[in-house]
């Protein structure tokens, strides 16, 4: 009996330990918040109470609860919140910046790998490594009829892959991303000097990158090192894919198109880490072995097209990573989605690998092409026909895609294929999954429901329902494509952007809001109604008129600046294109005080000879004073005739300033010479005294 009780207590303790471990594992990673304000991106590690074992206590009798008024210093709390929000914002911005800046480096890496494939000595060595029997099979296949060739090509390619796997071995880690290390280095960069332990841990993580990325081979001598790997028939799985690419190019006869595909291992800005410090200190995130078995999918694979056999047929070959024969050589159509290459997005099972883009490069023409829709789902937003008012244009995902597209144009130095773009668009717009929760709708750039529209957003009149969303309370709401959402702005906002509302344009929405100034003084009654318009309801702001008509209908040229003065005593010019003819803008600078020069000039002049100017408001500063829009005055407006006079004053002032500096320098030199002549050189006198 005692033995049974002892065993049961031990089992209970073990179960409690396992439950604690499971809790910790679940709370390590979270998806990033969708709010663009970046208010909370990681939770405080000391505030996590999930690991506390709560004890049940029976309550006999009454329970008295006393509420106390806890006074907190508002200014201190506000200062802490501002500091925390600023740190969180910088943390998220840095993660996104790393994601963007890695794109060109990864594209250059793909182009450099393709240059190795053209090396003649490397081709000769790999070609000779193929047995004559395999070469004979490919030659016999080449002379058969097209129907037989089309049916047997996959079998032939599969045999070549199996031979390659049995003869070429993996001996080191390939290219990979490490979420834990990057998150730690970003998040605790400012905290490494708190104590000696934090400093040593941070330094160790920074310098010992092989623990987090593996022991990758050093390629100091370029293709010469690759030749040595081919000679030993040992490399990492990325280089081995290049070897198979070269072998396939040399063995497969006839016209063909070979592409090297690369899933860009970019930094994932959509995930946040709650306990990254604890994980680093406990060795979580280190590479387990040199075979990269923790990486679910490959980063490099091959696409093959044989136009003479079948137009639109595509063979996708992975000679290294996949275990199933179907995934090793997959026969499909070029307009079909391939789901087997997208890593799992479940953060419990996969955090070390996730890719947003797949880019391929042609062996013959060395042209880079984006083939992401073939392998990555839910990228419809990249191929939407968007209006200028679409909020998708400002999303992080779409901005990242535009950045990739720009670099592809730069590296290709020519326009992308229209046919290829049409195929990718067709795949993208048909390969999507409907969101199942409100959180998923908030995260996606493809869909939206009316209840999640912002106060300055509205659906197009022609918007069509894509599906129906069922909420938790069994109520239903229509799902629309996010491309049908229009972002609206007020008249003042459009004016700042250099656009004016079209005549007879009716507001698409009216927004009721409480100005910040009224909120600060707790005046909750003075609401303001703003009319909101779309981009399509605006036009470029016209120029200020340069003429006016008097009461007799005669037209006169405007020469008086007071004609443009508003009630605040200035003129609003947000774009140089709206500047009235006959007048010029003079930028204000710290070097020369233009306004002071004009005032000094006007002192001795008659009224008709004086230079008149008008302050120009070119925008507003909303951060200088909370709740206020402080106008930015960075230039003044003067008549064209006065413009030349002001420029002459500026030139004369600069000359006088230069001469005054020379005068000061010469006076100092004269004083120095006089002191030396009368009292001698102080340094020489001290040396003379020391000698005596």
Curated annotation (Swiss-Prot):
Entry GO CC: cytoplasm; nucleotide-excision repair factor 2 complex; nucleus; XPC complex
Superkingdom field: Eukaryota
Biased composition (Acidic residues): 28-38
Alphabetized Pfam families for the sequence: BHD_1, BHD_3
Chain intervals for the UniProt region annotation (Disordered): 1-38
Main location: nucleus
Keyword tags: DNA damage, DNA repair, Nucleus
Gene Ontology biological process terms from the UniProt entry: mismatch repair; nucleotide-excision repair
DNA repair as UniProt keyword: yes
Entry's Gene Ontology molecular function annotations: damaged DNA binding; single-stranded DNA binding
Primary role: Involved in nucleotide excision repair (NER) of damaged ribosomal DNA (rDNA). Required for the repair of the RNA polymerase I-transcribed strand of rDNA.
Further remarks about this protein from its record: Present with 78 molecules/cell in log phase SD medium.
Family: Belongs to the XPC family.
PANTHER family (alphabetical): DNA REPAIR PROTEIN RAD34, DNA REPAIR PROTEIN XP-C / RAD4
Protein name: DNA repair protein RAD34
Organism: Saccharomyces cerevisiae (strain ATCC 204508 / S288c)
Encoding gene, per UniProt annotation: RAD34
